[in-house]
Amino acid sequence: MSSLPTSDGFNHQAHPSGQRPEIGSPPSLAHSVSASVCPFKPSDPDSIEPKAVKAVKALKASAEFQITFERKEQLPLQDPSDCASSADNAPANQTPAIPLQNSLKEAIVADNLEKSAEGSTQGLKSHLHTRQEASLSVTTTRMQEPQRLIGEKGWHPEYQDPSQVNGLQQHEEPRNEQHEVVQQNAPHDPEHLCNTGDLELLGERQQNQPKSVGLETAVRGDRPQQDVDLPGTEKNILPYGCFGCSSSETFMEIDTVEQSLVAVLNSAGGQNTSVRNISASDLTVDNPLMEVETLKCNPSSEFLSNPTSTQNLQLPESSVEMSGTNKEYGNHPSSLSLCGTCQPSVESAEESCSSITAALKELHELLVISSKPALENTSEEVTCRSEIVTEGQTDVKDLSERWTQSEHLTAAQNEQCSQVSFYQATSVSVKTEELTDTSTDAGTEDVENITSSGPGDGLLVDKENVPRSRESVNESSLVTLDSAKTSNQPHCTLGVEISPGLLAGEEGALNQTSEQTESLSSSFILVKDLGQGTQNPVTNRPETRENVCPEAAGLRQEFEPPTSHPSSSPSFLAPLIFPAADIDRILRAGFTLQEALGALHRVGGNADLALLVLLAKNIVVPT
C-alpha cells in the first residue's frame, strides 16, 4: 500500500479509489455520528514522539484552526455547485478519509502560525495520553463541530432510510474528504485502523448549527496533519451540499481536563481503554436525542456486531434522552438505551365485584388455598335447599327460597344488616355421618365440632334429600354438610357452614358482595319442620307453609324440627324476586332450578354472574 506524507511527518495510509477502509463493518452501523475518538495503535512504539512535542503540535493545530476560521468566517457561503465541483476535482487515487492538500491554504497557515500560535490557543486545550508500554494511543476529541445537514435542513441520521445510506456507501466519491466530522491530533498506524481494546463513542451532534463548505475546505487545507482515516461508520453519514455558519457557535471549547475518561475493561482482549465523554458544553438543551454507541475495533478491521455499552458514561445535566438503536441499527441487544422517565406503573387489577376476570382470579386463588389439607376428609358434599319463611307482623309474606350449601348472605341480608350482623366465624368444622338405615326414626345426623362466632351462626337449613354427585371434598378447607342419601325417608340435618373465603367446589369468585360477605361470612341456615303450628327457632313466631315456589314445594318433604340447635338472634330476610327470563336462561344452560335460585341469590340477581358461579363449580385445581 502506498502512503501519502503530510506536514505532520507521518505517513497516512492511502486506500485505492472506491475501497472502504471499514472492511467488515456492519452496514447497519453507518447511521451513527462520531462524537468522540477512535484510538489507534502505532506500528512502532519508538516512533512516538515525546509528549511535550506532541502537546506543542496540538496547540499549533488549534491555533491554525482558529486563525483560519477568523479569516474565513466573513466570507460568503459557498455555492453547493462550487462545493461539488471542488470535491469532484479530488484525485481518484486518494482515499476518502485523507483531506485534500491545499498548498495555498498551507502557505497561509505557515505564514500566520508563528505569529499568533500562543495567543489564539486559549480555551482550546488538548492533552494526549500515551501508553508506550502497552502500545496504546488514546486520542482526544479536537472539537465538537456543529451538526451538518444533508442537502436540506430536515435531514437526521436517525430518520434516514438504510437503503439511502447503503447507496451513499456504494457511490461515495473523493469529495467526502471535505466533510469529515472528527478532528484528531495523534498519529495512527498505517497498518491497523483500530486497536482491539479501543472503543469508539458515537453520538449525535447538534442539528441546528451548520457550517459552510468554504470554511470546511479551509480548515481541511490548513490542518491536513490533523486529519486521519475514519471508520466507515463515521464517514458514510457525512453530508453533501452547502452548509450555513453560526458565528455564535464557532468554537465549542473542549477542555479535556473537564471531560471524564471512562475506563472500560475489554472482556475480549482484557485491555483497559478510555473513551471520551461528551462534554456538557457540546450539547444544547434543544438537542432531544443523543445516540451513544461504542464500537470495538480490531486490527483486522472487523467491528463487533453488538456495540459495547459504556456503563460508566456520564451524561450532561441537560435534558438529553438516550434512545436505543435496535430499530435503526438492527437487533443489537447491547445497545445503550437509557430513558429519562421511569416506566409507567403497572395498572392494578380491577376490584369490581361484577368483573368476570376478577371473579375467575379470586376463584383460582381460593381453590389453590382450599386445596391444602386443613380438615379431615369428609364423605360427600351436597347441595342444601332451604326455605326461609319469615313472616313479619305486618306485611311480610310467606316465602320459600332455595339456597346452595355454601351461599352467602347477599342483598337480601344487606337490607337487614342494620338489624342483624353476621360476623365471620373463625373456624367451623362440621362432620356428619351418612345414614344408610332407611328406618331411622328421626333421621338426624350427628354434628360435631361446631365452633363459630357471631350472633347469626346458629341458623338452620332446610335440606332436600336429593342425592348429589360426589364432588372433590379434599379440596375444601371449609365446611361440607353431608346429607343422608336415603330414598324416601325424610331426614333432619343440622349444620353450620363457615366460609372465611369461598367454598372450594361451589364458590365462584363472585365478590359482588365481598364487602358485605366479609362481615356476613357465617352462612345461616335452617332445618325445620314446616308443619302447621311449629315455631320458628329463629324468629320465635308461628309460621305456615305456602306454595310460593310450586316446583320446590312439589319436591319438598316434611322434616322433623331440630331439638339440638339453639335459637339465635332474630333475622329478617327480605327475599329477592328474580325475573323468569334470567331463571330460564340458567335452566337452559343445564342447571337445576335450585342451583339457579341459589346462584342468583348469591350474586344479587345478576344472571351473568350467577351463571359464572355455576360454571365455576366444575373447575378443579390439580394438586
Curated annotation (Swiss-Prot):
Q: Which GO terms describe its cellular component?
A: Golgi apparatus; nucleus; plasma membrane
Q: Does the keyword Ribosomal protein apply?
A: no
Kindly state the tissue distribution recorded for this protein.
Renal outer cortex and outer medulla, small intestine and liver.
Region entry Disordered: which residue ranges? 1-48, 71-99, 116-189, 433-493
Domain annotation UBA: ranges: 577-617
Composition bias type Basic and acidic residues, residue spans: 150-159, 170-180, 460-473
Q: Does the keyword Phosphoprotein apply?
A: no
Indicate the principal place this protein occupies in or around the cell: membrane
Location comes to: Cell membrane; Nucleus; Golgi apparatus, trans-Golgi network
Recite the UniProt keywords alphabetically: Cell membrane, Golgi apparatus, Membrane, Nucleus, Transcription, Transcription regulation
Stretches of Polar residues bias are at 1-16, 83-99, 133-144, 474-491
Q: How does it assemble?
A: Interacts with YRDC.
Function recorded in the entry: Mediates transcriptional and post-transcriptional regulation of SLC5A1. Inhibits a dynamin and PKC-dependent exocytotic pathway of SLC5A1. Also involved in transcriptional regulation of SLC22A2. Exhibits glucose-dependent, short-term inhibition of SLC5A1 and SLC22A2 by inhibiting the release of vesicles from the trans-Golgi network.
Recorded protein name is Regulatory solute carrier protein family 1 member 1
Taxonomic source organism? Sus scrofa
